[in-house]
Swiss-Prot record:
Family per similarity comment: Belongs to the UPF0181 family.
Protein name per the record: UPF0181 protein CGSHiGG_01050
Any one Pfam family match given in the protein's UniProt record, by short name: UPF0181
InterPro entries per record: UPF0181 (IPR005371)
HAMAP family to which the protein is assigned, alphabetical: UPF0181
Length: 52
């Protein structure tokens, strides 16, 4: 596992996504897992993008 540095705005968005999932009946732990996995995928894909 690795650390992802998020801006405050990105952190807020992640919290909102977790809250939305919980509002749909998903447990907090599962919601956190879902959002964390999505963030890792985004971060991994960003790392693969060639730098200009």
């Amino acid at each position: 596992m690795f650390d992802i540095n998020l801006t405050h705005e990105q952190q807020q968005k992640a919290v909102e996504q977790i809250q939305e999932l919980m509002a749909k009946g998903i447990s907090s732990g599962e919601a956190i897992q879902i959002v964390a996995k999505a963030l890792r995928e985004i971060h991994k894909n960003d790392k693969k993008t060639p730098e200009n």
